């Protein structure tokens, strides 16, 4: 009997499944950078005195690159760089090195005026771990900038979507808008490509160049073609942030949903100890908004894509979750079936589809984009 360990919050839980009931554990192929390659790429980052590093991700890979970057620049005699992170990453970023560097949170004024913040420094570098985004297609510096610093442009990006379905790994109009906005930002970006456990590549250059290259590399490594399946059990992976709120975990569901056949079932491991994680989800479960109001509102509300995706897809798929959130929120308001354990999940799937049913497992869904019936080579088309 194969035993698969899946991350759930801060712990690993075992999926005890018979060999005949396991279709496949879907894992992307990332070839790790060699140590000399890793060091060489960071040597090329042009940081000098009075430089600013804006950290946009909190993955283990991001922390590794940040710590090594600090060691690299201090080894060059650079002693004054400022490191700041997004407020939502509070408690997730620490710098493991022998230097006296620490990170601080961006202030409210910094968030309001990104241009003004950058103008205070000789050089600015954004640091981001490339992933998938259900609205933009890919996540990286440009999408973080719109989501965290540019409310008007975020609303415009949301209005450019062609439907209410998630589109991870797709170059779309929201993606192109994010790129075009960042062309005018006087900064560089470091985009990391890898999964929860390794770094496959690092791109440093203009924001546009780094993001387009990292998007291509990510889909090359993790855009996995699979046959459609009846069921999938989905874990975000071992990066803690993606377990912390329902909003973060739902991104992993949207990465995986396109391999399901009609009326298939996806079960998400989404502990969500930090709550719902977005204003739109909070408003929706509290009855302060509905899908029609969100659709008619010309201003983007944080997390509203998740409400609209759930509404649009509930007739085609069955979604379930293991979570610490109240059942009333999950089941009654959001339409998610709730489970207490993987054993209960497996029992439910076998009762529904038969004792010989085979289950697919995604153990690192934040950095995986399986899909069926789509030519991946034709999918990634940059402007």
Model-predicted segments: where are they?
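Short acidic-hydrophobic, aromatic-tinged amphipathic segments that line or gate anion-handling sites
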Residues: 29-38, 99-108, 206, 336-345
């Amino acid at each position: 009997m194969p035993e698969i360990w899946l991350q759930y919050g801060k712990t690993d839980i075992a999926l005890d499944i018979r060999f005949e009931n396991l279709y496949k554990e879907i894992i992307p192929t990332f070839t790790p950078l060699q140590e000399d390659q890793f060091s060489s790429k960071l040597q090329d980052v042009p940081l000098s005195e009075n430089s600013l590093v804006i950290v946009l991700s909190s993955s283990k890979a991001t922390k590794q690159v940040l710590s090594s970057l600090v060691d690299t620049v201090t080894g060059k005699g650079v002693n004054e760089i400022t490191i700041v992170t997004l407020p939502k990453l509070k408690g997730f970023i620490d710098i493991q090195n022998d230097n006296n560097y620490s990170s601080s949170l961006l202030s409210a004024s910094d968030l309001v005026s990104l241009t003004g913040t950058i103008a205070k420094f000789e050089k600015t570098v954004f640091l981001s771990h490339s992933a998938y985004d259900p609205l933009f297609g890919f996540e990286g510096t440009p999408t973080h900038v719109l989501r965290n610093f540019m409310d008007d442009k975020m609303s415009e990006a949301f209005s450019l979507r062609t439907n209410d379905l998630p589109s991870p790994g797709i170059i779309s109009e929201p993606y192109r808008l994010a790129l075009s906005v960042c062309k005018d930002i006087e900064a560089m970006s470091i985009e990391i490509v890898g999964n929860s456990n390794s770094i496959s590549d690092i791109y440093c250059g203009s924001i546009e160049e780094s993001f387009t290259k990292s998007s291509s590399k990510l889909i090359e490594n993790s855009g996995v073609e699979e046959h459609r399946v009846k069921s999938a059990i989905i874990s975000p992976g071992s990066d803690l942030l993606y377990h912390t709120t329902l909003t973060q975990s739902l991104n992993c569901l949207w990465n995986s949903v396109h391999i399901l056949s009609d009326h298939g079932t996806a079960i998400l491991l989404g502990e969500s100890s930090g709550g719902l994680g977005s204003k739109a989800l909070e408003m929706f479960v509290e009855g302060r908004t509905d899908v029609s109001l969100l659709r008619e509102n010309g201003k983007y509300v944080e997390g509203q894509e998740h409400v609209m995706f759930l509404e649009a897809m509930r007739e085609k798929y069955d979604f379930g979750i293991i979570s610490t959130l109240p059942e009333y929120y999950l089941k009654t308001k959001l339409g998610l079936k709730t489970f207490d354990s993987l054993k209960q999940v497996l029992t439910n799937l076998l009762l529904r589809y038969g004792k010989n049913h085979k289950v697919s497992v995604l153990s690192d869904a934040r950095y995986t984009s399986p899909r069926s019936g789509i030519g991946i080579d034709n999918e990634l088309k940059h402007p």
